Amino acid sequence: MEMLTEASIQYVNKQVESGIDCFQLFETYCGIIPEKMYTEIVLPYSKKILNAAMDKNCKTIFFPKNYNMGLKNINQDICDITSIDWQIPIESARTLLNDNVGIQGNMDPRIFFSDKKEIERYLVNLTSFGEKNTDWIFNLGHGFIPGIDVNNVN
């Protein structure tokens, strides 16, 4: 883990030198190990990588996919914004996260398999969260799924 972390920090440093304004770390497989194990063993390395960007005054976004209840372990010492997947209600994620950490995502990418009316209802419901939470960045809770109707995205 040390070697991967050091290589990642070198990557972060080069990205910052190249002029990025924000660095996002994806922990796509975060949820496949128990929360306690991830928090104790892996999160310190993620924090180190994110802190490398923060130390250079670069904003940070952390995406710990499926971390769910573990979101309570994320604070402003780890990242500026936490990106969340769609498998936890956004209100629950906001409650678990430290108030000083912004929130991004939560849109279920499977919604694009629905018809336009269903998509519209879903978006009205989701964006109402943003009306009450100005630190929320609208985004998918993960990437687009192959096979979606691109017209539904428009």
Regions from the PLM with identified roles:
Residues 1-154:
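Active-site loop segments of alpha/beta catalytic cores
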